[in-house]
């Protein structure tokens, strides 16, 4: 029968879903609440279809959840926060009350109704007791039954009104949560450089996860209760005085004493929370930097350095969180002890003043106290949350008022062809005004790009006036003539015409310019319309500052800028989204297939698409992690080209590609499809200067501009610069011959290797239609996926998750704590029994003092167990929290690179921010509430059955109904909450990506698109939160009805009981557990939801490690040359490297990136690695560091298979200057020598060799001066110089130079090459380069093509070999330079 009923229900509720096509757009399904009947709205029956689907059809999926009601969508709610008055006190809180709470008056009404019913229900009990005490002759069944119904209705009304209060409060919570998150994201898109130094992506994520969460928690319930509860408490106390007379004032006095204590404790709780959040911000900042720079940390074997820094902040955070927990425990103790002491004080005073304790007095008063308990317990909680809201509000307000980019156009255009500009003139208000950057609307008529009398600085004017700059080091500028490298002074570009470095202002170790010294001072600039303007200059001369001034990314102190409205900009370190290659090129523009194909061809991407599994639909990892540097630059260039703007500003777009590809890009892009447009090219590759219509040389912030002949008259000697680049084959022939004679035994003839023709030439005739399809192929798209879906467990949170959590604390101690909760509740229930015995003592067998004494003993014992259980719970949860974070951090730190390729940083940071925050702040309270409420309900139910066994029959039926309801509920509620947690990750991921690409997003005016993307992500997350809360109310209403029935059956059974006192106790207990039963289920579900955070953290803790970290952990000893043990502190001693049949795949299912590579490098050889961009050169280099493991073959260093060496020892033994240098926040010393291994003299010597000593020595704190995350403000070349100084200092026997000078001008590169030759002469060195002049004198050259080693020999032999690919590259570059010199 039950089986048939189940099948009928399944058919009834699942037929429509079974008939739907899998591709149905469920997001477009309207919210079922919109079309619900009045009864369905009243009972939340409109959620049942979803609940049945989750129970009968398996775990809920996103497609099973309907749309969010329009009233709750963020695009509707966010505009209400546009008019915040920041001049008032607590402006954000006031705005939410004004805009959201005032529109939700029914929420206020329900809270008032709850207060009124809580006063009426004790009166119903009073009259019921009067009836019970009547003689049988005076009782009438109808009147008794009527009183039972009244008790049922009063109980039901009280609990149902609480449920509706929660529901209507949810609307305000959703509005606040969505609107604030959206406003934070919109503000992020407008942050100035100063604001970015104060708020990195980790800080902003922490604000959203913690502070916005505080608003969400407060405004779903506490925002009205904090005002209603005091009046409710006062009304109940008046009623108490009416029942027990002036004795009630004694109880009131106890409460009055407790209120300031609770308020004081709540203040302490908020203070410690505020301090802990500050450390949490720092921890999240460091974690964000750690994740963003993880590959560099692994290459340098610096993981432990950052782990220690993060753990230091974590320890400080936990210190204040533990203090907060102590104050919270004291607050809860005082609250619960007060409720007990009020009973003791009131009843003792009442009895000792000569009054007779009767049933109606004692239990009516007890019911009043039961109704008082919730507001009494929740008022301090509400006050605590309100006080916690203040620091969160302040943090959000500070962020929303942080400085904005000075010249930020709105998306709306005006008829006068000007754009409205948002200009942040002060820190209090964002004022709309018209900027002096004139942006002309797009038209067919081009105009000159100009800067008129422009003065620019990286700091806002307020900072310059006040002299206070926080942690700002803009880098190091080399100040000299273009051929003079002797003079160097501070400031990437942070210098004007003055060379006085002592007029700056010192703060936090950095020298800042005074108001009379700027990055660019009173400059005039012109880029002729429709012409090519080339900007050149040595590293740190001010080129990036000039470009930033053009696009409005640097503070303009004075002057004006005239630039077209629609510009395209490519950064030196390209910004790529974690989406398909195609979407990165389109960048929000509609697809024009004809133009798209031309762009692909012009940017020389066709050969690269051939190598990608899904061609242009291939998913690009975060920051283009699965692409080479050249591929990333060309995709960025393709995006600019496809946008078809009036003006193109290109910052070093050709530095990471080989000469042949660079020429192709220059001819087909810059001089091809961009022809007749205004082009501004920043480049170190001076061979392109002859093609320029206008040239600008930047030197120490000073601009010299004109045509080539005009600049030559001014003393700019381009010819001498070009001579440093020319490849003299004859000289190299001689040097190579000498080298070959010495090492002829190690060379292998190129004739023994495969020959290769130019991949570029071989694809020219290829039909691009075979590569790019106009229709999206689902199979290709699925094949192109790089990011994995976020893990999501199904079903209830398993016992193993709980066991693992308490294993981190103490499992045995937890069981003891559970026992203490039940023991303390039994003791408290015994006090009620004792009170019943007291009131039933009509013969006065004992005086009142006797009963008072034992009543106090029960209450005292309850208090003792209360204190112990709370402190034990705090000890367990804090130990677990500390251990979970530590294990999570270590697991992520030592995970493989593939883990970071397939999981965006925002998703990972979500574990460290929101999930850890839930574990830190909520789990202790959740476990405490569940155990307290659960023990109260269990003990009370057993007591009621013991007193009135008759109710066990209806109880059994209600238990079955209760079981069915909670099974239906939990099957869906947990899944909804899991999906809600998962849908938070895209919010954080988009925020992280947008933050990293702010310059690109703003230049392409893509703010509106990104805002809409964020709105979509937030709405999806709110949608899950909305339905999760809705099913809470569905189960809540049904459980409240069950508890009301329990009251009815208990009261009805009491009509037939002979023991009046215990019958009244049973009814009173039933009334008391009404709210507790529902609160127990709610807290159990909330606990299960929050345990999902533990589940998510545990899933990352189980992440496979990349390999054995220390050699000592290997089971087998390494046998090398007959020796069993090795001293790896001195390995490698020679530097001999050998690749044997090496094959490398980045993913098991991917095609090999390197195929059967075999070659040997003798000790002290310098090997040049060349090849087309994307050919696999960098893969050869990083394979030495085991950043990706060999799928076949082996690599040996000094005869040792590196797969048998611990990763730490291996990477620590090698040196590297990476292609994309990364600078970490901290001091200069920390970035060069993080473990304090070297003396100051050694560090200064290394800095002198890379031409940075003068710059750093001019800083007041010198080596202790600070730099920002990723070296913001340093030019690309300056970062490379710092990385080079690390490697020189390390003095490894094997060194990898991966495009180590790609961001440096040729003069500096020539000097550094001399430095490299001098300092690495005794090392084995692999140099990956596109600049052939940097590797032409190498011992041997390895040519890589399509992942294969196609040539490997001395430069002389390769040049002599007909058809050699290397010879073609050399001849191509040499001919190009000679042709360029002829043009000069």
Swiss-Prot record:
Its main location: membrane. It is found in: Membrane. Residues 505-724, 1137-1371 form the ABC transporter domain. Keywords: ATP-binding, Membrane, Nucleotide-binding, Repeat, Transmembrane, Transmembrane helix, Transport. ATP binds at residues 537-544, 1171-1178. One of its GO terms (molecular function) is ATP binding. It holds the Pfam family ABC_tran. GO terms for biological process: culmination involved in sorocarp development; transmembrane transport. It comes from the Eukaryota. The chain crosses the membrane at residues 112-132, 140-160, 226-246, 247-267, 333-353, 813-833, 852-872, 941-961, 1036-1056, 1061-1081. SUPFAM superfamilies: ABC transporter transmembrane region, P-loop containing nucleoside triphosphate hydrolases. It is a multi-pass membrane protein. Residues 729-756 are annotated as: Disordered. One of its GO terms (cellular component) is membrane. Residues 104-388, 814-1093 form the ABC transmembrane type-1 domain. Residues 735-756 have a biased composition (Low complexity). PANTHER family: ABC TRANSPORTER C FAMILY MEMBER 1-RELATED (PTHR24223:SF172), ATP-BINDING CASSETTE SUB-FAMILY C (PTHR24223). Belongs to the ABC transporter superfamily. ABCC family. Conjugate transporter (TC 3.A.1.208) subfamily. This is ABC transporter C family member 2.
